[in-house]
Regions:
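Ser/Thr/Pro-rich, acidic low-complexity intrinsically disordered regulatory segments
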Residues: 9-10
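Metal-centered catalytic cores of metalloenzymes
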Residues: 2-5, 14, 19-77, 81-145
């Protein structure tokens, strides 16, 4: 009897915990960065790619941005939002100047509003140069399973 009660309690605990585990997801984030995606578009052969992950349980965003053919060294880089394609927005996540040489690697823990905007596709990443201080290459961030 006691053993059956223990097994029943264990089964109930697993059943109740399973939906919580299922709700957490590791998502892939990506963006193709081009000069044509800047607002307004820029004249540059620069291009790049963002790859990374977003953990919905810890709210941690990890990124790797690789770029090349800019008009000069990167002077700044940021995640911006919320903004749809073709619109500009303020900085959501700054990237330290010491991390600017390609590849740019980093991580940040997002707030609830930041997570909402990221998952809605309302963030973009851009890389700035001295010739293009408003941004030389840009890409809209998508989060997918």
């Amino acid at each position: 009897m006691k053993r059956n009660l223990t097994l029943s309690t264990l089964a109930l605990t697993i059943a109740l915990a399973s939906p919580l585990v299922a709700m957490a997801d590791m998502l892939n984030v990506h963006a193709d960065l081009t000069a044509a995606s800047e607002v307004p578009p820029k004249a540059s052969d620069g291009h790049g790619q963002l790859t990374g992950t977003y953990d919905t349980s810890t709210k941690e965003l990890q990124w790797n941005v690789v770029y090349s053919n800019l008009t000069g060294p990167a002077t700044m880089a940021h995640f911006h939002g919320p903004a749809p394609v073709g619109k500009n927005a303020g900085v959501a996540i700054p990237i330290a100047a010491t991390d600017l040489p390609s590849p740019i690697k980093g991580h940040a823990t997002l707030t609830d509003p930041q997570e909402k905007d990221l998952l809605a596709g309302e963030w973009y990443v851009n890389v700035h140069t001295a010739k293009n201080p408003g941004g030389e290459i840009r890409g809209q961030v998508a989060a997918t399973k």
